[in-house]
Amino acid sequence: MLNVTIQFNGNKVAADLNRELDQTVRQISQDYFDRVKAKTPVRSGRARKGWRLKKQRQFAYEVRNRVPYIGRLDEGYSKQAPRGMTRPAAREVLNQARRRYKR
């Protein structure tokens, strides 16, 4: 007679998946933050220095800039960044993530 017991430890698997997913979201958020900051035009440097990356909760990060004129810069009012910063950075990061995580 042979008895085999297979037990699935769902809590450990879920914790491992959550940890890996959080690391992936953090990396993508950091990549976006780095790119949007690098694309920000520089005159005085205030707009570029104004970028902040903050974790909101699990799997959620916020990239913000409270410089009053950042909206105009992002709309393309600078010859240094005529297409703005956020949309081009998002496109680049999305394409990079697709290549990196493609299976």
Predicted regions and their residues:
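Short, Lys/Arg-rich flexible segments
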Residues: 1-103
